[in-house]
Amino acid sequence: MKKHSNKALAIVIIFSLFVSTFPNISGTSYSDIQIDGNLSDWDSSDFLGQRNGAGFALTWSEDNLYFYWNGTDFYNDIEGADIFLYFSTSNSGSNLSKSWNFVEHNLPFSANYGLSIEDSNYYEFVEWNGSSWNVIESEDIELYIGWSGNKASEIKLPLSYLGNPSNISLMAWAQWQHEANVWSSFPMLNSASETGAEYFTHYYSTALEEDISSSEIQILSNSLKLDDAINLAIIFHQHQPYYSSCLA
């Protein structure tokens, strides 16, 4: 009996060492993230890219969407920024963002909801009512906003605010704090010209299910020119793993 117990213990120890040596690298969703400015509970494959010094990531649980934006001090009057997230859950939304600093951006989809964040002291969650953007109560949204000592921002958005969709399309961007000049946007195929109103063309689209990693989130376009070989080559090169999986 003791001999079998020793074998069982050895198997448990070996299995534990194997798991610790090869941690989960799939980055699948259904993650619960603590909104505290500490990114250690994020998986590396939740990461969607980095542009002009800002990193962007997305994951979700059964009840919430989670985002991080890393690399920006939102309280700096000179280098600070405002961040925007827009969401489409149906075709009955608006193709223009809510005016901010007197500028509206063209969106790549019909957006039903938007989140605009200046800093932890002020943000707006808006819903399209068919003719205009309305600010609605959003006390359950949780934020940690990056500052000079920790430039990692985290956002928790309850899915109930979006009508508990099973699929979602979204995009994000940051613009100057006191102007509407966009300096970073995601997906990264979008413009970020820092010149005012933008015409965004690309967005993320995904089912909100378990076992989906960032590499499986689709990047779609509302204005892809099929006769433009250069654009097609760029898109295929940047997203080759996704297209390869489609062809397999």
Question: What are the roles of these predicted feature ranges?
Answer:
Residues 1-29, 67, 155:
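Secretory targeting signatures
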Residues 30, 34-44, 77-151, 193-196, ...:
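Extracellular/luminal beta-rich ligand-recognition
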Residues 37, 64-72, 152-158:
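Short, well-ordered beta-strand segments enriched in hydrophobic/aromatic residues
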Residues 221-248:
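Carbohydrate-active enzymes and regulators
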Residues 174-223:
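A recurrent domain-boundary module in secreted/ectodomain proteins
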Residues 147-194:
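Ser/Thr/Pro-rich, low-complexity mucin-like regions
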Residues 25-32, 219-226:
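Low-complexity, acidic Ser/Thr/Pro-rich repeat tracts that form intrinsically disordered stalk/linker regions
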Residues 73-79, 161-166:
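A short beta-turn/strand-edge loop motif at beta-sheet boundaries
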